[in-house]
Amino acid sequence: TPDNGLEAIKQFDGSYLEHFETFGEKVASRNYLAQSIETFQKAAREGYMIAMTVGLSEMNTADGERNLHKTDEIRKGLGANEDYNKRLNYLLSLFLVCAEKHSYFLAHDGYHAHKNNKVWMTRPAEFDRPLGPPKGPAVQDGYIYTREFAHAKVRVDIDNQVGEIEWIEPEKN
């Protein structure tokens, strides 16, 4: 839709986001992703609840035709020794440049409890770090977004799919 669903969300208290990085059968172009970020930001600033869920593993493009309603099932799944921290930092940074008071985030390796699911019933250490309130909205410079919080500086480059979070330790009294 021309407004990316902002008019439709008025009928609800919020929205559940998945397919955030995909468009049709392909990984979203940087322009489409930038537009999605802008829409998320607008809805979140207007007070809508936004729940964003994203997959940690790569898209499995070797499967040919995919069922676009099953994006979780078309991911490769994390390998036994695969380090997913780089991807988690990217996804969490992407979320943080958009998030407001009623925004929620889940990064997963599928919605199953198989023994090969590396993140089932785990909690990333980043979730326990103090973030604090945002110092303002994200600043966009091309395809790079930055945002500061009381205890973190976030930078995400959607063109290169790189996210960085610099954690700032709170001062002790």
Where is each model-derived feature located?
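Glycan-processing catalytic domains of CAZymes
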Residues: 1-173
